[in-house]
């Protein structure tokens, strides 16, 4: 895996409050190597280790993107939903930013069926077929389409399982993480001081509740993805 310089600035991370962990009483002892100190009953994350992990993750996604692999970004907590959609769209990644439907990956054949239904309904809407149906039936199909758009819109172009997943909150996305582990899909995940870093391939110690913190981490990762894709197209 190639190593590059990603301009990860500790002061910028401080300003984004990446270093702020949870209350000390909520901590997971496995996060001890990533904790710098505690202040007012709150754990403070060691940003030097955050920078090291983030740089490693950027190197990985850069290489994978350069090989044309597919990414899935997951973040359904309210602080992350808009950030995930924006970052994933910019980097041409698949994403889930609403409810994670159980079995979305482990029961891929069912997901494929749902995606085909989504595609068919969208085509019917775009061609005006809904307008030719009785109002009650058209309304029912429109509701189905809206639901599919809400939960599957971010993966509508996903034709197979992703090659790697980026997860913004380990505890909130435990089902998604579990499915990735079951299938052997590599994971990059923000881990706050109440998380278990052993559950992911590349843990990035960081505040997983703050919008600025999530945005900074996602921006660095998706920038690396975009650079990898650009290099591949040369």
Curated annotation (Swiss-Prot):
CDD domains: RPS2. One of its GO terms (molecular function) is structural constituent of ribosome. One of its GO terms (biological process) is translation. It comes from the Eukaryota. InterPro entries: Ribosomal_uS2, Ribosomal_uS2_bac/mit/plastid, Ribosomal_uS2_CS, Ribosomal_uS2_flav_dom_sf. GO terms for cellular component: chloroplast; mitochondrial small ribosomal subunit. Keywords: Chloroplast, Plastid, Ribonucleoprotein, Ribosomal protein. It is found in: Plastid, Chloroplast. Belongs to the universal ribosomal protein uS2 family. This is Small ribosomal subunit protein uS2c. It comes from Pinus koraiensis.
């Amino acid at each position: 895996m190639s190593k590059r310089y990603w301009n990860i600035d500790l002061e910028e991370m401080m300003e984004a409050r990446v270093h702020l962990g949870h209350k000390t009483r909520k901590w997971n002892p496995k996060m001890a190597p990533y904790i710098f100190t505690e202040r007012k009953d709150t754990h403070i994350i060691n940003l030097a280790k955050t920078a090291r992990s983030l740089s490693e993750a950027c190197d990985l996604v850069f290489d994978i993107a350069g090989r044309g692999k597919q990414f899935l970004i997951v973040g359904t907590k309210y602080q992350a939903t808009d950030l995930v959609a924006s970052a994933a769209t910019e980097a041409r990644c698949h994403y889930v930013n609403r409810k994670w439907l159980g079995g979305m990956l482990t029961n891929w054949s069912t997901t494929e069926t749902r995606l085909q239904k989504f595609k068919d309904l969208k085509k019917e809407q775009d061609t005006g077929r809904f307008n030719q149906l009785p109002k009650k039936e058209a309304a029912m199909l429109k509701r189905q389409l809206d639901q599919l758009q809400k939960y599957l819109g971010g993966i509508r172009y996903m034709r197979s399982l992703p090659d790697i997943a980026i997860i913004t909150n380990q505890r909130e996305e435990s089902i998604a993480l579990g499915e990735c582990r079951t299938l052997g899909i590599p994971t990059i995940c923000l881990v706050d001081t109440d998380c278990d870093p052993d559950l992911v391939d590349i843990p990035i110690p960081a505040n997983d509740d703050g919008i600025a913190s999530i945005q900074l981490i996602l921006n660095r990762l998706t920038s690396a993805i975009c650079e990898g894709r650009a290099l591949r197209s040369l």
